[in-house]
Swiss-Prot record:
Belongs to the ATP-dependent AMP-binding enzyme family. MenE subfamily. The keyword Nucleotide-binding applies. It comes from Staphylococcus aureus (strain N315). InterPro entries: AMP-bd_C, AMP-bd_C_sf, AMP-dep_synth/lig_dom, ANL_N_sf, ATP-dep_AMP-bd_enzyme, MenE. This is 2-succinylbenzoate--CoA ligase. Converts 2-succinylbenzoate (OSB) to 2-succinylbenzoyl-CoA (OSB-CoA).
């Protein structure tokens, strides 16, 4: 199969592929730049490299260049400590790291993109490629390609089953795992997203999530497969993002619930040109859903994982009207089921589809990961009679107290409705009698007593679900994509 970027350069060449508000690259520009850089990357003779990058056009060129050079990319979370980065890269035998940000890491060859000479210094906002390397460009037809054609520089085809990217799970409930994502995985995910969410060549997708995460990288894959425009943003600033939404004909945006909340606080009270607001990474509260729908915001709640190359469950605004607690229905190209449902229909969510990884690179032990072709997500879920899927908690987060199963999400939902509590999380606390009992961590600027909380929670929860321990904290630990890091609270 021809590389998707190569196809877009041939068929959709003059369409804007990527812009950061200052510079804009057409698909022709992007392909030419990536192919020329790929030729230089081949000189490093690496089949797998780490990428320590920001959300920038240069980073996107680097990603495509690696793929054109048949190099697997291992994405590095830039918020990790040096020790965490080292452990991750060593676990998958990475020796060289390309970066667009300053990085010092012992034991690796670090190569800054600024130190690699290629043509990408003088791309202008009008989409014309300057001749900075002495390469002559054939402009006799609508497709602008080097006379030293990319086909003579690189192989323009690839194998769908080759590894495209490697990402590490967020590690919110345990050790991080290295997830290999093939081009087939990414393609199946993009097709599923198109079917459940909807996008086309006229889409203008504002990408604010880090591209070292699957939620950010997936936008780039969808774009190059479909041929739409990505508006890349390096850092989230609610005021600036709102201005872009108002002024730049943004049709799609990917957010986590907290960033949507900030935008609504900033004044996102109407959709403007927005057709789809894709949400994921954390649970949506009923209050946020109600507020967003009152503003007629086109919110689509979703659920996905690094192992599934992003979303595979999507809830439309209509679904959220009917069932605010749902993450929707599966894409047509995946199959989901509940393993060993209890009397309430709750059990572990299993998924099978071409978007699902084949197995972890590290650790390699697959015990319990796959069963009869289905991947065990580790999430407790329910599928109702209409096909709506509800996600309750991670299996590892389930609190078992005296033989009773307690879902932290149920307690957290009630606690967040207490006046003055802005955030809350419930974890299992060791107990000599019951094995575990619930402990509630909460964020509040008010003075709230344990007795007040017990009285309130007792009105809404069964007695065994009411937390026995409470702790007020300034903040709760979240990852850069808004996922709660419960493992950092288990010590308490």
């Amino acid at each position: 199969m021809d590389f998707w970027l190569y196809k877009q350069a041939q068929q959709n060449g003059h369409h804007i592929a990527i812009t950061d508000g200052q510079e804009s690259y057409t698909y022709q520009n992007l392909y030419c730049e990536a192919s020329l850089l790929a030729k230089r990357l081949k000189a490093y003779q690496q089949s797998r490299v780490g990428l320590y990058i920001d959300n920038s056009i240069q980073s996107i060129i680097l990603i495509h260049a690696c793929w054109l050079a048949n190099i697997e990319i291992a994405m590095i979370n830039t918020r990790l400590t040096p020790n965490e980065m080292t452990n991750q890269m060593r676990s998958i035998d990475v020796q060289l790291i390309f970066c667009t940000l300053p990085l010092e890491l012992r034991g690796f060859q670090i190569v800054s993109l600024d130190d690699i000479e290629f043509a990408g210094r003088d791309i202008t906002t009008n989409g014309l490629l300057d001749n900075t390397m002495g390469i002559q460009y054939d402009t006799s037809n609508e497709t602008v390609v080097p006379k030293e054609s990319p086909s003579n520089i690189l192989n323009t085809s690839f194998n769908l089953d080759d590894i495209a990217s490697i990402m590490f799970t967020s590690g919110t409930t345990g050790p991080q795992k290295a997830v290999p994502q093939t081009f087939r995985n990414h393609y199946a995910s993009a097709i599923g997203c198109k079917e459940s969410l909807g996008f086309d060549r006229d889409t203008n997708w504002l990408s604010v999530l880090p591209i070292y995460h699957i939620s950010g990288l997936s936008v780039l894959l969808r774009a190059v497969i479909e041929g739409f425009t990505v508006r890349i943003v390096d850092k989230f600033n609610a005021e600036q993002i709102l201005t872009m939404i108002k002024n730049e004909r943004i049709t799609h945006i990917s957010l986590v619930p907290q960033t949507l909340n900030w935008l609504m606080q900033q004044g996102l009270h109407e959709p403007y040109n927005l057709q789809k607001i894709l949400l994921g990474g954390a649970k949506l509260s009923a209050t946020m859903i109600e507020t967003a729908l009152q503003y007629n915001l086109p919110i689509y709640n979703s659920f996905g994982m690094t192992e599934t190359c992003s979303q595979f469950l999507t809830a439309t605004p209509e679904m959220l009207h009917a069932r605010p607690d749902t993450v929707g229905m599966p894409s047509a190209n995946v199959d989901v089921k509940i393993k060993n449902p209890n009397k309430e229909g709750h059990g572990e969510l299993m998924i099978k589809g071409a978007n699902v990884m084949n197995g972890y690179l590290y650790p390699t032990d697959l015990t319990g990961t796959f069963e009869n072709g289905y991947f065990n997500t580790g999430d407790i879920a329910e599928i109702d009679h209409e096909g709506y899927v509800m996600i309750y908690d991670r299996r590892k987060d389930l609190i078992i107290s005296g033989g009773e199963n307690i879902y932290p999400y149920q307690i957290e939902t009630v606690a967040k409705q207490f006046p003055g509590i802005s955030d809350a999380v419930c974890v299992g606390h060791p107990d000599d009698t019951w094995g575990q009992v619930p402990k509630l961590y909460f964020v509040s600027e008010s003075d709230i007593s344990k007795a007040q909380l017990i009285a309130y929670l007792s009105k809404h929860l069964a007695k065994y679900k009411v937390p026995k321990h409470f702790e007020k904290v300034d903040t709760l630990p979240y990852t850069s994509t808004g996922k709660l890091q419960r493992n950092k609270l288990y010590r308490g």
